[in-house]
Amino acid sequence: MFGSATRSDATRVLLLGSGELGKEVAIECQRLGLEVIAVDRYDNAPAMQVAHRSHVIDMLDGDALRKLIELEQPHYVVPEIEAIATDTLVSLEAEGVNIVPTANATKLTMNREGIRRLAAEDLQIPTSPFEFADQYDDFVAAVERVGTPCVVKPIMSSSGKGQSVIKTPADIEASWQYAQEGGRAGTGRVVVEGFIKFDYEITLLTTRAVDGIHFCAPIGHRQEEGDYRESWQPQQMSDEALKAAQDVAEKVVNALGGYGLFGVELFVRGNEVLFNEVSPRPHDTGMVTLISQDLSEFALHVRAFLGLPIQQIIQYGPAASAVILGNGISSNIRFDNLTAALSRPQTQVRLFGKPEINGRRRLGVALTRREDTKQAVSDAINAAADVKVIY
């Protein structure tokens, strides 16, 4: 049973993180009449614009987080980002607060070490070689053991922040400094990942729901500077590789537990699949599902954590998304030339409503459906380029 928003028996959903992914989750909650409370570290974040009310707090401050949750008494707490005081969520869950999908899943995946050790050591799933380091000297030794080229990432970051590639020993010091500057929780521990040869990488959106495990068609994507630029669905795979990917994803999400949608990132080499990362929430590359499926990743997430059945996911055919990327300084962002973008057949645009920009920032996404994925990607890129950002 669900209560109506703003009434005494309202079913309340509290979003921890209010970016573009949280905004779409909020919209899906609104469609079911739920009361939405959006939280972020800055005011007027995208999800706040479609929520019933909002709060600005430092979500890494456990006391502030506990105080807010005790104030709002939500039926569901839905993390949208990694930078949250997860130990507080674990304590609150033990006291009866419903954390989506679970507090442990949020804690394990908030940093790359927890989830990498779960996959490689506990579940014995193949991954790229990796080492962790806290201090610079240990970092240098880790790079030597893993070998170059290698990828360096803060254990907690997103959208490519703090990530770099070490090609030669001359890159080591700069890579360390960049990782220290880019972590979500400040300076500290990093992971060094060895390069592996792979044919392509995918996101396998996997929903753990009351009626079982459900897979979306695999999503291919291209990244630049550690952040996604385009994604497409379906990514063509052999039956053997797809089955292997689904087996890995099912093991991971079952180990994490709870109900919700998970974005499982995998490398594919022939029919072999290697685990990369997982997010216990909608994934940025999954924005293509806003046009490619009858139930978007956001609708799937909400339906799952509410304990509702998924039944069947219908994929409409080749589709793609392309990021509308801003690069400037402004607190009054405007957009022009939407007419050109939306004059393209089977094309949609989402503008996220971010209140300001200081450098490079994802401001929207263009979505297309076509007869094949190559054409869909090309047209999505062109539609995104049509949109002019005015700073």
Swiss-Prot record:
* Ligand binding (Mg(2+)): E265, E277
Q: In which pathway does it act?
A: Purine metabolism; IMP biosynthesis via de novo pathway; N(2)-formyl-N(1)-(5-phospho-D-ribosyl)glycinamide from N(1)-(5-phospho-D-ribosyl)glycinamide (formate route): step 1/1
Q: What is the lineage of its organism?
A: Bacteria, Pseudomonadati, Pseudomonadota, Gammaproteobacteria, Vibrionales
State the UniProt keywords alphabetically. ATP-binding, Ligase, Magnesium, Metal-binding, Nucleotide-binding, Purine biosynthesis
CC per GO annotation: cytosol
Report the protein's function: Involved in the de novo purine biosynthesis. Catalyzes the transfer of formate to 5-phospho-ribosyl-glycinamide (GAR), producing 5-phospho-ribosyl-N-formylglycinamide (FGAR). Formate is provided by PurU via hydrolysis of 10-formyl-tetrahydrofolate.
Task: State the SUPFAM superfamilies in the record.
Answer: Glutathione synthetase ATP-binding domain-like (SSF56059), PreATP-grasp domain (SSF52440), Rudiment single hybrid motif (SSF51246)
Q: How does it assemble?
A: Homodimer.
Q: What is this protein's name?
A: Formate-dependent phosphoribosylglycinamide formyltransferase
Organism of this sequence: Photobacterium profundum (strain SS9)
Q: Which residues bind N(1)-(5-phospho-beta-D-ribosyl)glycinamide?
A: E20, L21, E80, D284, K354, R361, R362
Family in the record: Belongs to the PurK/PurT family.
| InterPro entries in UniProt | ATP-grasp, ATP-grasp_carboxylate-amine, ATP_grasp_subdomain_1, PreATP-grasp_dom_sf, PurT, PurT/PurK_preATP-grasp, PurT_C, Rudment_hybrid_motif
Which residue numbers delimit the ATP-grasp domain? 117-306
Q: Which GO terms describe its molecular function?
A: ATP binding; magnesium ion binding; phosphoribosylglycinamide formyltransferase 2 activity; phosphoribosylglycinamide formyltransferase activity
Q: What's the name of its gene?
A: purT
- Example GO BP: 'de novo' IMP biosynthetic process
Matching HAMAP family: PurT
Identify the NCBIfam families for this entry.
Answer: PRK09288.1, purT
Q: Which residues bind ATP?
A: R112, K153, S158, S159, G160, K161, G162, Q163, E193, G194, F195, I196, E201
